[in-house]
Amino acid sequence: MKMIKTICGAVILSVGFIACSKSGTPGDPADTGPYQLSYGDSILYLRPSSGDYIVSPLKHREGVYSGFPEGIEIDGVTGAINVSNSETGLRYRITHISPKGDTTKTTVVLSGITFTDHFYILSAGDSVANPVYNAHPNRVLPLAGSVFDEGNLANGGGCSVKTDNGKINLAESIRRGVFGHTPDNDDKKEIEIKYRINDGSGKSLNKLKVLLYWYNTMADVPQYVWDILSDRSSQGVFLRGSSVEEAAQASRIEQAAKPRPPCVIIVDH
């Protein structure tokens, strides 16, 4: 009787060992079915960290990972996104291509603010650039407890950034001499805005560079500026909804898209 119990126990242990060993093996159907590429959430926030904050796919597959547009730092082998070293405030398309050539895509937003590429006509009263939060103009930017232009880099350089809401007063910036005493056509000024948002980031320090342009009239805007805006439009809008996916479905060859820095183009009249 004792021997029978011993044999039964050995059989049970063997079955249990086989079951445990099978889980997660390369031959598991769960690892060979359609790949569900996901990072756990569609919006990834910076987190307080002693080093770089990195987010990996919930499930890894062999193959090559890539991100579009330019600005996201992604490991091509593991798919891990270095949020700390990426341009935030934008929507990115992540693509995985398996060794067999199967393609899987998903989109993620790296939380933060940006500004739209836009002509601001001062004589028409269009003089305030509003920040866009989490890649969608309709998302409400949480202001309570948030701070913008930490360190006073932008305001100290003549760019009037409201510290409580991140808005840029362009007319006031001109009066403060952001382009000098008298701006000239094609004057440019790159500013950096450091900020902390009271959201899922836990007020982690974030930053954004914005490129300001000055022109007396629309007729003075040179062709290269129009080309920049045209390229960004044709390569996909990196803000509203699923437009990146829609752009990807177009029958064209994608080139490297550079959505940063946003172009704030100030025109006098």
Ranges and model annotations:
Residues 1-8:
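Bacterial N-terminal signal peptides that target proteins for export
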Residues 16-19:
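C-terminal motif of bacterial Sec signal peptides marking the signal peptidase cleavage site
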Residues 21-66, 109-161, 203, 210-269:
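Solvent-exposed, low-complexity, repeat-rich "mucin-like" stalks and linkers
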Residues 24, 69, 85-87:
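Disulfide-rich extracellular repeat modules and their boundaries
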Residues 64-82, 146-180:
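Low-complexity "stalk/linker" and mucin-like segments enriched in Ser/Thr/Pro/Ala/Gly
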Residues 74-129:
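Intrinsically disordered, glycine/charged-rich N-terminal periplasmic/extracytoplasmic linker segments
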Residues 87-102, 106, 177-199, 208-210:
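A short beta-strand micro-motif common to beta-rich folds, especially ectodomain repeats
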